[in-house]
A protein has these predicted regions:
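A short beta-loop-alpha structural element at the N-terminal edge
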Residues: 30-44
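Single conserved hydrophobic/aromatic residue that forms the stacking wall/gate
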Residues: 1-14
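Conserved GNAT acetyl-CoA-binding A-motif
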Residues: 146-156
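Conserved beta-strand-loop-alpha-helix junction that forms the acyl-donor binding cleft
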Residues: 154-164, 181-183
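Conserved acetyl-CoA-binding loop-helix of GNAT-fold acetyltransferases
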Residues: 124, 130-143, 170
Length: 187
């Protein structure tokens, strides 16, 4: 008997990538929770991400800065509801990260109660792109979200960051809602 088309699609989208990712991890990369020793590299990568955002929105982002300081990262590493996962190479050097936040949708009159794992930031070192590190990190986040009994994995992407949009769509993500703006010119 051959599997149904729907079951085959599920296999291709969910099970097969995890098998391939697991094989990759054994060969040359590991994904683990971030540790204090990773902070200097994470700061470097945060700078790369901020520069991408500053290039897209110079009216909002300040070039040459990072989202977090060393002290803030040290505190974040202690927060179990905001896990940071790092992809490290065979020399245990961080080549990518995923900052996550466990979010709980409380019950209300119009919405069911559920948990989400929000990807606050995902980055792969610009020198290491094209090696499927981003895919590995994303699959790892999905696996962790399942362990936490989350309903979904969510994130935000800045308009204009087309490479990120394409990557997340390739990973199976769909637009859930859009945040829109009207910039006032009175400043």
């Amino acid at each position: 008997l051959s599997p149904s088309s729907a079951a085959s699609d599920v296999y291709k989208r969910q099970i097969l990538p995890e098998i391939l990712i697991d094989l990759m991890e054994v060969r040359n990369m590991t994904i683990r929770k971030a540790e204090e020793k990773d902070i200097p590299r994470i700061i470097e990568l945060l700078g790369q991400v901020l520069q991408i955002h500053a290039d897209i929105r110079p009216d909002i982002f300040i070039p040459g800065t990072t989202k977090y300081t060393v002290e803030e990262l040290t505190e974040l590493l202690k927060n179990k509801e905001k896990p940071i996962y790092v992809a490290v190479n065979e020399s245990d050097v961080c080549v990518g990260y995923a900052f996550c936040q466990l979010q709980k949708q409380p019950f209300s009159n119009n919405m069911l109660q559920f948990k989400s794992l929000f990807i606050d930031d995902l980055c792969v070192d610009q020198q290491a792109r094209g090696q499927h590190i981003g895919e590995s990190l994303f699959e790892h986040v999905k696996k962790e979200a399942r362990k936490m009994h989350c309903y979904e994995v969510t994130l935000n992407v800045w308009s204009g960051n087309t490479s990120a949009e394409k990557f997340y769509e390739k990973m199976g993500m769909k637009t859930k809602e859009r945040q829109m703006e009207y910039i006032l010119d009175n400043l």
